[in-house]
């Protein structure tokens, strides 16, 4: 691959160069808000200050892909995001919800993240960056990363157009992952050279750690367990609204048949003798998990958004991962790989039909 090494302090000039040289028309980039982190959409390069202190911050609020969902205009936007966010953006391209030619995906390494409120409350202890050793030490003090991050096996910046890899101590390796990425780096004023970025051993370690954490998660493995798991759900649909790959223009559960009220509710009770309320609680989640079964990137935004603190990571990512394994599909890995449900083969999945 082609790339270069920059000091952390040089990253500000790099991001400003993307705007100044018209590589992108706007940039979605993290910013510091008090002790926490949020995103901003930048048009004026002078609004970017000290990005090195925040782009690797182990904090997760909203999935950046959700910000650019529906970006189907000619103006080009760059996104500085974690791997799960980039992967969600790639799935949106496949779903025709994001124009591939109008987005530049800049992915940063991620060791794992804390819910934004946890990060802000413990910023003094967590700081601007973490590694696996620090995460383990903080967990011993009761400050734990999100379950979605603990079971994630795609933490390195190896998807998207440009990688910002923390692979060399005080330096950041800035490398193009696609021809578009190479062209963007050159246009931004960087001089590229051949870079060897072998992270196989690191990926193996991450995969082993993620599997161990996944195996340790409490299981929702029966109808009774699922009913108990979803007992407190108020069907607010927050999990749908923050999901980067849930995009239906008209949701069934916003329609009268999917969200009955008044007389319709009474008629259902009359027909069945009794109904659980809120209605369609189980059907809502089963429908959603089917809809995102191949495109879920396990970012955990659904769990973060739940007002009842239901640990949805134990449901959505766990179930969708099983479907993805059946199809041998990794969402967001390759923008050219077709979505499993959009392809057909005469002989496929025979082992699942036996």
Provide a role label for each language-model segment.
Residues 93-96, 233, 322:
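Alpha-helix boundary/capping residues
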Residues 1-226:
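Iron-sulfur-associated redox domains of electron-transfer enzymes in respiratory
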Residues 82-87, 143-156, 231-252, 293-309:
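Local cysteine-cluster metal-coordination motifs and their immediate loop/turn environment
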Residues 4-11, 236, 299, 312:
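Generic structural signal for well-ordered, non-membrane alpha-helical segments
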Residues 12-13, 227, 237, 290:
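Residue-level marker for well-ordered alpha-helical positions
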Residues 114, 235-238, 325:
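Alpha-helical scaffold segments in carbohydrate-active enzymes
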Residues 207-231, 248-354:
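Ferredoxin-type iron-sulfur electron-transfer modules in oxidoreductases and energy-metabolism complexes
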